[in-house]
Amino acid sequence: GIDMEAKFAKHMIYITNNDTPGLVGKIGHCLGSQGVNIANFNLGRDKIGGNVIELIEVDSPVDDSVLDKLTQIEDIVQVKKLNF
C-alpha cells in the first residue's frame, strides 16, 4: 500500500501514475491551462520510481474534458473526480 495523509474536500481529483520526474509539473500545467485552480496537493508513493497516488483538492467541479486531458499525459494510469 501507499501511505498518505490528506483531508477530503468538496471537489477533488484522484490520480494514479508511475513515479517519473516532471509529472507533477505536467499535472499542474494541464490543470492551470484548463482554468482549474489547485487548492491543495497530496502525494504518496510506494518507492522511488514506483507507484504514486495524488489527491488534488480543486476550487470547483472539474469537467470530464479536463480528466480526459489528464489521462493523455504519459505515465498517468488512472484519473477520477471525487465530489463529497
Predicted regions and their residues:
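A conserved regulatory-domain signal marking ACT and ACT-like small-molecule sensing domains
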Residues: 1-84
